[in-house]
Regions:
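Metal-dependent amide/peptide-bond hydrolase catalytic core
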Residues: 1-12, 29-30, 47, 59-61, ...
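Predominant activation on well-ordered alpha-helical scaffold segments within soluble catalytic domains
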Residues: 22, 45, 123-130, 159, ...
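Acidic/His- and Gly-rich active-site-bordering loop/insert found
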Residues: 2-113, 134-139
Length: 299
């Protein structure tokens, strides 16, 4: 390699990067806690503004955090350029940092809530832009970074912003992590979400249990039947991620609900799988089963 070529290779400080990642990780950001997510949005916006990036912050709604867009301090903003996409929320609740997911380093591996998905990647986008400015470098195309606050629950409030930004871009780089062995992710499974409501009949558990129709018992049977749709061999998965029901310990439960997650890879008839989730005859004819939802993101 010539000296000229070597001089064009950027130099990065690994410890500086890790310190920045840790700073982001230690601000806990569960998707449904908009106030918590916005604490990190504040930090990111401040860091990007400091290097001259133009930031636009769109207030969140429905309890979610704000959407943050940052444009590099160069290039024509109207020219199709490079969009870097990341999310700032995680699946972990407040308190995970102090209990189940304490930040720690073991050799070359670092652990913490959301560090893999995807605070490390999101931070690297910010760091790269900072590094370009610090080194006096520019890309040929304009660069914008879009950080969303609720990707882990399907981007219900930021989807329109993502699609609009993507349409204006020539290239899109998503900062999600690689897979085992450093494999690059180039596609995603289709993703669907469904809500199930089961209505039974309440009765006193002590004096008249025979008069009741347990919505929870029906839910248990439905849960097993739903998850039997999963086929690991082809990559189809159906997971009942949340379930609840009942009103009191001494009452046969008249109501139960569940939230269902569906993943379908390319090449699979997603509509057929969706119908198997939606069409739910009751095991107990005295219970009513209702399912709503569908595919949120196609494969």
């Amino acid at each position: 390699m010539t000296d000229s070529a070597r001089s064009n290779i950027p130099t990065f400080d690994g410890e500086e990067i890790l310190a920045g990642i840790r700073r982001w990780v230690e601000i806990e950001t569960p998707s449904h806690d908009g106030v918590a997510v916005n604490k990190l949005v504040d930090v990111v916006q401040s860091d990007l503004t400091r290097i001259g990036a133009h930031t636009v912050r769109t207030p969140g709604r429905d309890g979610y955090g704000d959407v943050l867009e940052a444009r590099a301090p160069w290039g024509d903003e109207n020219e199709p350029g490079i969009l870097i996409l990341g999310h700032l929320d995680t699946v972990h609740p407040i308190g995970a940092l102090a209990t189940t997911h304490v930040f720690r380093r073991e050799g070359d591996i670092v652990f913490g809530p959301g560090i893999y998905d995807m605070k490390a990647g999101s931070y690297l986008a910010c760091y790269a832009l900072q590094h370009f400015v610090r080194e006096g470098r520019r890309t040929t195309l304009p660069v914008r970074i879009l950080y969303v606050p609720e990707e882990e629950v399907g981007s219900p409030t930021s989807r329109a912003a993502i699609e609009a930004a993507a349409r204006k871009s020539k290239y899109v780089l998503v900062m999600e992590p690689a897979r085992d062995g450093g494999k690059c992710v180039t596609a995603r499974k289709g993703w669907g979400r469904f809500d199930m409501t089961i209505t039974g009949r309440a009765s006193h558990a002590g004096s008249r249990p025979q008069d009741g129709r347990s919505a929870l018992r029906e839910l248990a049977r439905q849960l097993l039947d739903l998850e039997a749709i999963s086929d690991p061999a082809v990559g189809v998965s159906v997971v009942v991620g949340m379930a609840q029901g009942g009103s009191a310990p001494n009452v046969v439960p008249a109501l139960a609900t569940a939230t269902i997650d569906l993943r379908v890879p390319p090449g699979i008839d997603a509509d057929a799988v969706v119908q198997r989730v939606l069409q739910r005859p009751a095991f107990d004819p005295d219970c009513r089963v209702e399912v709503s939802g569908g595919i949120n993101r196609p494969a």
